[in-house]
Regions:
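Conserved catalytic or regulatory cores that recognize and/or transform ribose-phosphate-containing ligands
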Residues: 1-92
């Protein structure tokens, strides 16, 4: 299964890349393909990330939401978009 990772990034700028990378490793070890938006380059304007992230989400079968997802406007939008598309929603 292709799984897109989603969660609050801005609130944990120092650690989100490692947190996402750890989950990516865990899911890949279980045989999944992981679509990881934390691999995008740092430094773009915030309004530039979401169109890229939604395109990445298009390539996935499911979305994985980290525990903090409800505190992120981006993750809220990604969840709604995934549900609209009928993708499976997985919770951390």
């Amino acid at each position: 299964m292709k799984i897109y990772l989603s969660g609050a990034m801005a609130s944990c700028m120092d650690t989100y890349q490692q947190i996402f990378a750890n989950k990516q490793y865990e899911l890949e070890y279980a045989g999944h393909i992981v679509v990881n938006p934390a691999a995008l380059p740092v430094g773009l304007d915030s309004d530039r990330y979401m169109p890229i992230c939604l395109s990445m989400l298009d390539a996935a079968d499911a979305i994985y939401l980290f525990n903090d997802w409800e505190h992120s406007n981006g993750a809220l939008l990604e969840k709604a978009y995934a549900e609209y598309q009928g993708k499976e929603v997985l919770y951390g």
